[in-house]
Amino acid sequence: MTAASHQQCPKCAYVRQEQDTAPEWQCPRCGVAYDKIITAPPADPGAPRKPGASAVARSRGQRFKAFRVTVLLIILIFVGTDTWLTRLRATSWGHPLRVVVYPINGDGSEAAAHYIAKLDVTRFAAIERIVKQQALHYGITLEDPMDIALAKPVNSIPPLPLRDGNMLKTIVWSLRLRLWASKWDGYGGPTPEVRAFTLYYDPKTHPVLEHSTGLEKGMIGVIKLFASDKMTAENNIVMLHELLHTLGATDKYDLRTDQPIYPDGYAEPDLQPRLPQHKAEIMAGRIPLAPNRAEIPDSLADVVIGPKTAHEIGWIK
C-alpha cells in the first residue's frame, strides 16, 4: 500500500484506491489536482458509527421532553396533594365554607365597570340562604354553611379553557389558571377555600354568555355573569352551580340537549306523574316540564340540591 492510497479529494471527496492509475497528484474521479492531501483511515465495517447531527438533536429533544414531563408530574403531585387536603377540609363541613368573589370587567364596558363599582356582598345573600336551607335538610346544622366575601376588582382576564384541548393541554391550562389566581389573590381576610373570579358583561352587547367553569382541582371558579341588577337572580343560579362544581358536584343534564337526566337531575324524582316537575336540581339547571322540554328557573327559590349532589359535596357520607 503506497502513501498516496486513501487520499481524499477535496472537491468530490473520492478516496483514492490502490488500483487507481491516475497520477498521485490527480483525483481519478474528477481529475482535479490535489491541493491538500487528506489521509483517510481504511473503512472498518465492524467499527461503531458516530450518530449524525439529526440523531443527536432527536436524542436531546427526547431527553428534554422526558425532563418536562417529569417536572410536570412532580408539580401535579404537589399541587394535587395540597388540593386534596384543602377539599377534604372544605367538604368536612366542620366550619363555614369560605368563598371569596373577585369581580372582573369581562368585556371592558362602562356598564360592567359601573356595576362592579356598586357591587356589594348582599348580592350573594340568596346563595347563602339557599345553601343554609338545603344543608339543614341533610343534617348540616352550621349557622352559616357558606360564607361569601367580596374582594377588590381584578384588572386581568384569567386564562380561558380550551374548547377542544387534549388531556395534557387541559392539565397545563389548569396549572396556568391556578398560577394566575395566585398572582391576583389580593383578598386581605382569611384564606378562602373557594375563589370565584366573576367576569361581568354588558347584557346589551352580550345577550348570551359562554359557559362558566368550576374547577374542582384548585377550587377555582371562572364565572361569567351579566352586569345588570335585573339579572341578579339568574346570576346567582349560575354562580351556585359553579361553586358546587369546585366542591366535586357533577353536571346532571345531557350535554347534547341540556335536558335534565332522570333521576339525579330531577328535584322530585318520585313525583307521580313524573312531569311536570316544579323545581330544578341545581346541577341540572332546568325544570323538566315535558319530554324534551325544560325551562330555566326564575331564581334560587325554584332550586333544590338533590341527594346525589349532596353526596358529592360531602353532605351525605
Name every feature range the model reports, one short phrase each.
Residues 13-18:
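Short Cys/His-rich zinc-binding micro-motifs
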Residues 31-40:
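Short Cys/His-rich micro-motifs in 6-15 aa windows
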Residues 39-49:
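Short, intrinsically disordered terminal segments enriched in charged and Pro/Gly residues
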Residues 52-81, 212-216, 221, 226-230, ...:
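Metalloprotease/metallohydrolase-associated module, dominated by Zn2+-dependent proteases
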Residues 59-72, 77-189:
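Propeptide-to-catalytic entry region of secreted or membrane-anchored zinc metalloproteases
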